[in-house]
């Protein structure tokens, strides 16, 4: 289950009030990029892609935290809301190589749970789309991948 576009935008607004920062505009731009790309791909739902993009970083609502903490906080929040598909995106968006990201033994409980989760699934088209759009989008718009990945 996923929220409506309106619910997703309201969740982002609330989260930005809780933890102001450029991440919220970045998230909106991820949603816009995901929607625009999904519109051109047969079988993809552009509205779903937009919602996934808008909410991929919703775990940042808890404050300025490291990647595993915001990933897991987003997953937990979305699961509590009953948004299992969005929760999946929260877990997968920061791990482009999925299980191969973990060339080390995770130390924190968050990292252990993330590793277990991403190791148990294969990235689908929405996971890959949000990973791509996460790299393209910044708070002020979009950049070429080379610039974003080298920043």
What do these predicted ranges mean?
Residues 1-3:
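Non-catalytic interface/linker regions that flank or bridge core catalytic/transmembrane domains
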Residues 5-20:
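Generic N-terminal amphipathic, Lys/Arg-enriched alpha-helix
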Residues 21, 36, 60-62:
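Short, contiguous strand/loop micro-motifs
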């Amino acid at each position: 289950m996923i929220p409506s576009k309106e619910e997703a935008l309201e969740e982002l607004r609330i989260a930005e009030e809780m933890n102001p920062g450029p991440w919220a505009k970045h998230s909106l731009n991820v949603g816009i990029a995901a929607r625009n790309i999904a519109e051109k791909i047969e079988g993809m739902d552009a509205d779903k892609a937009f919602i996934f993009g808008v909410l991929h970083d919703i775990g940042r609502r808890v404050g300025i935290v490291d990647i595993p903490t915001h990933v897991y906080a987003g997953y937990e929040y979305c699961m509590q809301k009953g948004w299992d598909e969005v929760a999946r995106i929260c877990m997968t968006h920061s791990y482009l190589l999925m299980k191969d990201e973990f060339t080390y033994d995770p130390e924190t409980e968050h990292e252990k749970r993330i590793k277990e989760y991403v190791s148990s699934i294969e990235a689908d088209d929405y996971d890959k789309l949000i990973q791509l759009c996460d790299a393209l989008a910044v708070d002020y718009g979009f950049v070429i991948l080379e610039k974003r990945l080298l920043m």
